[in-house]
């Protein structure tokens, strides 16, 4: 059982079709009063932080059943989950770091150079939309429960997160939200279809909702998970593929925006796949429409089945909730015109029989139990209710420009012995030019594969290169770091133990949750006042790169004061403890000149998803002056 599968499926339709099973499934993903994060890249939480998708399923179940006992349980679980997340977040950052929701095979979507540590420190558009939704829904839950004061707190958090999402993910040049922003500040401008649909459905997209949907790139057989595709990954899974549950969310967004043409495309994609395969496959190849040539697949996939329910419940029939009412707002494309029946649908104490005739998104007439009425049904209604809707045929809107076709990206540029004076990189096939960025900001454009750097560079600069042509671009290259002479030092580990009672041997230390290995002290270091980044060289081979729940966490203490929690995710395959990597950075402000102490400690904040295995090998700290 997967948290995200259950949650997305519940919101797509299982909360209506099978409420008891949905409740049991949602409850099964709660442990210790918080939502369980699915296993994933680098050992799961907090590299993966999309467990808050549970809120979508929990709220959908409440809407369909009206059970206040369930609502109290769900609100308590979500509040505790957000509190646990907050304990390991970077100080002062509104956005939530972590990998992209559900697109959790690193090699399929992320730049090749990014490690699990890099992903843990990056910011994904889709994951942040979920965190916004979670706070939005938790505020609504608390208002339903009469706790307006706490509801206001989460509503304010949601508003702050919405503003930050717009600020950090919106691309003015592309007029859409980018898929991901690296820890270094570079925006990956690929389109994430699920995230875009969710942003529309929760109101985050605002006036951009319809243009975003109308310009979602399409393949021959549906809306790809993301575009442009990653060109060097030929096998389809998240890359080069259509997932019916994602298409269902895109369809629901299109129906809400009364985009009948787009809805027809999504419906056709989903119905063709189900009929062609004789089952609800998890995914299929975007360009061939085949399900046999993807890396991993399955029949009767839960969220694909739920997506088909969503097609009818929320797409074609347009069922949605508004305050204390159920509203029927059909979206029937012209190619699906005719009569459509939905009978025996149980919502709270009602049983609905809905009949729609015609096509379009505008209602001509409504009959409720044989009498003229409106398509708005109070949620406290009881008994069997028959609803007849006649739609008003509408002329096709003025033809829009065709949506962009899905395309491939360019390969990432590779460095060719760059120096602090001259950046050099290898030519990228198909590239017309290159964009050079410094510290997350555009720095230069180059037709050739080099760029001369200025003599005065400050304490630290970081450069990356992007290949571009008229049709597409590449992901950013691995950052090239240029610390000034003397601005970067390595600090050796010195003593380990609850009271630092043991000397470190051979320059490395084993850390786990026992008292004798719960604290590691480094040699004192002379520093001037300024801003510094702190990283640690570590090894975590508790499980594979892609799986598990044993991401290690340690609190960084500077002069005895917490500077944040360091994430030390799996960096190699299970058992390969000789392979070391560099952690993501924590930024530290040093106020006074003199000797300063650094230590890594296991504290209550560092409890991981596993709860028991929380281990790693560590070597030096890397301390770099930034300002």
Question: What is each PLM-predicted segment?
Answer:
Residues 453-474:
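Beta-strand-rich modules
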Residues 479-627:
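Extracytoplasmic
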Residues 364, 433-436, 554-556:
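Short beta-strand elements bearing conserved aromatic residues within extracellular beta-rich modules
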Residues 1, 20-45, 90-123, 163-243, ...:
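Extended glycan-interaction surfaces of carbohydrate-active proteins
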Residues 219, 253-422:
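Non-catalytic C-terminal accessory modules of carbohydrate-active enzymes
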Residues 441-448:
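Short beta-strand segments within Ig-like beta-sandwich modules, predominantly Fibronectin type-III
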Residues 2-6, 10-99, 103-104, 111, ...:
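Aromatic-rich carbohydrate-recognition surfaces in CAZymes
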Residues 420-430:
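Conserved aromatic anchor
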